[in-house]
């Protein structure tokens, strides 16, 4: 099933910041036990990529993505760690195009009608 469809069916995506990658698996287990088999791990900490990898390795069925992604390099690190989707706080056409080129769903933030028009022009 398509990642965006999975997230739509789950209905809510917990956004988490993990400072210690060792905390990722117990947190993922708690989310799954609570009926939320998904998470957006923010790239605001140095542990983000390792946390994503730990969660995906322990629970391959979990839909884990990366949030607060600002650059193509962060996209690559997140995807290499196992992220199944990317969220960014703003609309950076370079980052969006990179996600599209490598086949990872991306949800950029939009703040005004111009952002929406750019997103539409990018096929989002």
Where are these regions (language model features)?
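Conserved N-terminal beta1-alpha1 strand-loop-helix module at the mouth
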Residues: 1-84, 101
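Conserved anion-binding
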Residues: 47, 70-73, 79-124
């Amino acid at each position: 099933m398509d990642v965006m469809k999975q997230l739509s069916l789950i209905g809510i995506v917990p956004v988490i910041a993990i400072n210690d990658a060792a905390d990722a698996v117990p947190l993922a287990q708690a989310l799954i036990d609570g009926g939320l088999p998904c998470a957006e791990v923010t790239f605001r900490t140095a542990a983000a990529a390792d946390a994503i990898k730990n969660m995906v390795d322990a629970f391959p069925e979990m839909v884990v993505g990366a949030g607060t992604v600002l650059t193509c390099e962060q996209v690559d690190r997140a995807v290499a760690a196992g992220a199944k989707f990317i969220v960014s706080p703003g609309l950076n056409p370079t980052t969006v195009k990179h996600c599209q080129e490598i086949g990872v769903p991306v949800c950029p933030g939009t703040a005004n009608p111009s952002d929406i028009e750019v997103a539409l022009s990018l096929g989002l």
